[in-house]
């Protein structure tokens, strides 16, 4: 077990995980690991290689030759696929709608989980995703399960898309999120589920600062000797 301090934040799509995790990491001076970005990058890699998303073995073979890395950036950290920056490209609708399938492949998860654990074992981390508290960092000192209503999550995604010049109507986003929730919670390998020792935090109707404050108090309590 690592002697570093590990904070796991899990939850469904658009619950606010990455937004909250980034702020906490900055405040605590911890390393932020966006595991979802790793799966998204692999999804984009498959697309760029001309692979069908259903080609599990092809995706697994490609992963062995794929380097995924992060670099600090403002306002968000930068993501690289081999030597190309893909920070924006991995947020496309096509990647979003296919990442659950790529993430369901056993060998893909095993490889990326190993990479994620290597990072967590060398420094203090905040890691967010779907299975951090249950699979990736089962011994994390703090586990948070972040949730929000489907409508609120769709509205958040709508605002994000609009800011990027992308137009997808609210009802479509609601449907996409419900579909993603089902895929994530029903996959055979590491489904989205609240760890038994995770603390549930509902962000519906809450400001970002209120959620950050609530989780900061949880962390401080755990850090007391």
Curated annotation (Swiss-Prot):
<dbReference type="GO" id="GO:0036430">
    <property type="term" value="F:CMP kinase activity"/>
</dbReference>
<feature type="binding site">
    <location>
        <begin position="11"/>
        <end position="19"/>
    </location>
    <ligand>
        <name>ATP</name>
    </ligand>
</feature>
<keyword id="KW-0547">Nucleotide-binding</keyword>
<dbReference type="Pfam" id="PF02224">
    <property type="entry name" value="Cytidylate_kin"/>
</dbReference>
<dbReference type="GO" id="GO:0015949">
    <property type="term" value="P:nucleobase-containing small molecule interconversion"/>
</dbReference>
<keyword id="KW-0067">ATP-binding</keyword>
<keyword id="KW-0418">Kinase</keyword>
<dbReference type="GO" id="GO:0006220">
    <property type="term" value="P:pyrimidine nucleotide metabolic process"/>
</dbReference>
<keyword id="KW-0808">Transferase</keyword>
<dbReference type="InterPro" id="IPR003136">
    <property type="entry name" value="Cytidylate_kin"/>
</dbReference>
<protein>
    <recommendedName>
        <fullName>Cytidylate kinase</fullName>
        <ecNumber>2.7.4.25</ecNumber>
    </recommendedName>
</protein>
<dbReference type="InterPro" id="IPR011994">
    <property type="entry name" value="Cytidylate_kinase_dom"/>
</dbReference>
<keyword id="KW-0963">Cytoplasm</keyword>
<dbReference type="GO" id="GO:0005524">
    <property type="term" value="F:ATP binding"/>
</dbReference>
<dbReference type="GO" id="GO:0036431">
    <property type="term" value="F:dCMP kinase activity"/>
</dbReference>
<comment type="similarity">
    <text>Belongs to the cytidylate kinase family. Type 1 subfamily.</text>
</comment>
<dbReference type="InterPro" id="IPR027417">
    <property type="entry name" value="P-loop_NTPase"/>
</dbReference>
<dbReference type="GO" id="GO:0005829">
    <property type="term" value="C:cytosol"/>
</dbReference>
């Amino acid at each position: 077990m690592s002697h570093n301090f590990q904070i796991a934040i899990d939850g469904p799509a658009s619950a606010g995980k990455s937004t909250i995790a980034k702020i906490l990491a900055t405040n605590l001076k911890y390393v932020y690991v966006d595991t979802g970005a790793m799966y998204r990058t692999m999804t984009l890699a498959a697309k760029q290689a001309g692979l069908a998303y259903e080609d599990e073995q092809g995706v697994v073979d490609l992963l062995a030759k794929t380097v995924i890395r992060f670099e600090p950036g403002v306002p968000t950290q930068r993501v690289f696929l081999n030597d190309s920056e893909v920070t924006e490209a991995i947020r496309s609708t096509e990647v979003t709608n296919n990442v659950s399938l790529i993430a369901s492949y056993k060998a893909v998860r095993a490889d990326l989980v190993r990479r994620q654990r290597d990072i967590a074992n060398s420094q203090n981390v905040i890691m967010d995703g779907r299975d951090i508290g249950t699979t990736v960092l089962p011994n994390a000192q703090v586990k948070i399960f972040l949730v929000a209503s489907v409508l609120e999550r769709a509205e958040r995604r709508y605002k994000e898309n609009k800011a990027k010049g992308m137009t997808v109507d609210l009802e479509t986003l609601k449907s996409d999120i419900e579909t993603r929730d089902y895929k994530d919670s029903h996959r055979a390998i590491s489904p989205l589920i609240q760890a038994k020792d995770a603390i549930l935090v509902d962000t519906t109707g809450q400001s970002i600062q209120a959620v950050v404050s609530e989780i900061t108090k949880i962390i401080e309590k755990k850090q007391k000797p």
